[in-house]
Curated annotation (Swiss-Prot):
It is found in: Cytoplasm. It holds the Pfam family FtsJ. The active site is at K189. This is Ribosomal RNA large subunit methyltransferase E.
Length: 244
C-alpha cells in the first residue's frame, strides 16, 4: 500500500499492520496482515480479479500458452472465479477481439459463485456419482482445456491434506481423459508430498508433455505446485468384438 508522507519527504511504502483483536488468534492476525500487504492481493483489487490465484493461471498460460481464442475451457473448483475471469479474457469468450474466434468457459464449484460475464457457472459437488455426466451435458462437446484448482477443506494434518488434494486431481484427470480433444491440456494444483508420483505417471502416459511448475504468484512457503499436461494423446479406441 502506497501512502504519501505528509512530512514532504516524498512517498514511501508503508506496511499495513493489524492489531490483534480480542478473541482473534495471533495466527489469524498474521494471515490477515500478510494478505493486506501481499502485492498480488493489492494488484488483484486494482485490476478487478477476484483473488490472487488469478495470477497463477495467468503466469502458467504466459509460459505454456494453452488458453487460446476460440478455446473451450472447463474450470473445476472455480470459486471465487479468478481463473474463470482469466479464461474468459484469454479465449475471447466475450468476443471483444472481433478478428478472433470466441471461446467458451464453464466453471463448476461446490459453493455458489457470483456470476462472471462470459462464463457459465454451475454449483455442483464434482465428486458426486453423476457429476461427470452433468458437466459433459453442460459443456455440450469436447474441451480444449480442463483446469482444476479444487482443494479439500484443510484438516491441519499435512499428509491428510496432501492425499485429499491428490484424490481430487485424479478425479479431475479422469474427467479430462473423457472430455479433452486430442492435443488438449490439463492443468491442476497439487500439494507436494510423494503421492503425486502415480498421478504424474498416469499423465505422462496420456499426454506428450508434462511439466511441474511453481509460478511466481504461488507463495514461497506453500507446498502447492501446478502440473501442466499438454498434447492429450486421445482416448484409446474400443477393442473390436471378440478381442481380449
Amino acid at each position: 500500500m502506497t501512502t504519501k508522507n505528509t512530512s514532504g519527504r516524498g512517498q514511501r511504502e508503508l506496511r499495513v499492520r493489524v492489531k490483534t483483536a480480542k478473541g482473534r488468534k495471533l495466527s489469524s492476525t498474521l494471515w490477515l496482515e500478510r494478505q493486506l500487504n501481499d502485492p498480488y492481493v493489492i494488484r488483484a483489487k486494482k485490476e478487478g480479479y477476484r483473488g490472487r490465484a488469478a495470477y497463477k493461471i495467468l503466469e502458467l498460460d504466459d509460459k505454456f500458452g494453452f488458453l487460446k481464442p476460440g478455446g473451450r475451457v472447463v474450470d473445476l473448483g472455480c470459486a471465487p472465479g479468478g481463473w474463470c475471469q482469466v479464461a474468459v479474457e484469454r479465449v475471447n469468450a466475450l468476443g471483444q477481439r472481433k478478428n478472433k474466434p470466441e471461446g467458451t468457459v464453464l466453471g463448476v464449484d461446490l459453493q455458489e459463485v457470483e456470476p462472471i460475464s462470459g462464463a457459465e457457472i454451475h454449483q455442483l459437488d464434482f465428486l458426486s456419482d453423476d457429476a461427470d455426466e452433468k458437466v459433459k451435458g453442460w459443456l455440450g462437446g469436447r474441451a480444449d482445456v480442463v483446469m482444476s484448482d479444487m482443494a479439500a477443506a484443510a484438516s491441519g494434518h499435512k499428509g491428510t491434506d496432501h492425499l485429499r488434494i491428490i484424490a481430487l486431481c485424479e478425479a479431475a484427470a479422469a474427467f479430462a481423459f473423457d472430455v479433452l480433444e486430442e492435443g488438449g491440456t490439463f492443468v491442476a494444483k497439487v500439494l507436494a508430498g510423494g503421492a503425486e508420483n502415480e498421478l504424474q505417471a498416469l499423465l505422462k502416459k496420456n499426454f506428450t508433455k508434462v511439466a511441474n511448475v511453481k509460478p511466481p504468484a504461488s507463495r514461497a512457503d506453500s507446498s502447492e505446485k501446478f502440473v501442466v499436461a499438454m498434447g492429450f494423446r486421445g482416448r484409446a479406441s474400443e477393442p473390436e468384438e471378440g478381442e481380449a
